[in-house]
Swiss-Prot record:
Family affiliation: Belongs to the UPF0758 family.
InterPro entries referenced in this protein's UniProt entry, alphabetically: MPN (IPR037518), RadC_JAB (IPR025657), RuvA_2-like (IPR010994), UPF0758 (IPR001405), UPF0758_CS (IPR020891), UPF0758_N (IPR046778)
Record's protein name: UPF0758 protein BCE_4545
Domain of life: Bacteria
Zinc as UniProt keyword: yes
GO molecular function, one term: metallopeptidase activity
Positions of short motif JAMM motif: 174-187
Native species: Bacillus cereus (strain ATCC 10987 / NRS 248)
Domain MPN: start-end pairs: 103-225
Length: 225
């Protein structure tokens, strides 16, 4: 058969994508499509294999920095920026799926909304979701990055954004990079402090969710709110 089917070979992932769809391609082939070309020493698929091996698969690759990518022989600034832009677009698309009038009715809803974004983070991120009177997410904000400590989490930073967004309530989240979402004493102290401040100013802190690896803990369900 003449035409595009005649040129579909192992080294031509773009042609396979056109014929069979993106879903039929392996991770190495999809990465090769983004990279477009290899180097003088290796094909684009071999370069894809090297990148995936360097980052131990997609889990670490999705958070790769420019410096980490260009340290790999065959990956220049142009290829690295293409990959970083593609990964960021993917994150934003996933986020849009949930941001469109996403309502939070339970701790499970909240954990589902943020799990994939937070469970792989290598540092603790303290994030607040700001809700309207219908419990719909109207804004989210990363308040700080680092170990959770009551002397670091300033209520004014948490509630300042609530006033700016005219939020009716707040849900706080942070991740445990260890994968174990069991709350620490500091987690509980920070939560109680924020809840008390919320009572005083009239913006309820509905929950504090701790994200682990496919696991979460609700401090409200644990009786700390």
């Amino acid at each position: 058969m003449n035409g595009i089917r005649d040129v579909v070979k192992e080294e031509q992932p773009r042609e396979r994508l056109l014929l069979e769809g993106a879903g039929s391609l392996s991770n190495r082939e999809l990465l090769a499509v983004l990279l477009r070309t290899g180097s003088k020493e290796e094909t684009v698929l071999k370069l894809s294999d090297k990148i995936l091996h360097h980052f131990d698969g997609l889990r670490m690759l999705k958070d790769a920095t420019l410096e980490e990518l260009v340290s790999i022989h065959g990956v220049g600034v142009a290829k690295a920026t293409q990959l970083i832009a593609a990964f960021e677009l993917g994150r934003r698309m996933v986020r849009l799926e949930y941001q469109n009038r996403y309502s939070i009715r339970s701790p499970e809803d909240c954990a589902t909304y943020m799990m994939e974004e937070m469970r792989f983070l290598q540092q603790e991120h303290f994030v607040c979701l700001y809700l309207n009177t219908k419990n719909q997410v109207i804004h989210r904000q990363t308040i700080f990055i680092g170990s959770l400590n009551s002397s670091i989490v300033h209520p004014r930073e948490v509630f300042k954004e609530a006033f700016r967004r005219a939020a009716a309530s707040i849900i706080c989240l942070h991740n445990h990079p260890s994968g174990d979402p069991a709350p620490s004493r500091e987690d509980i102290e920070v939560t109680k402090r924020l809840v008390e401040c919320g009572r005083i100013i009239g913006i309820e802190v509905l929950d504090h969710i701790i994200i682990g690896d496919h696991k979460f803990v609700s401090l409200k369900e644990k009786g700390h709110i």
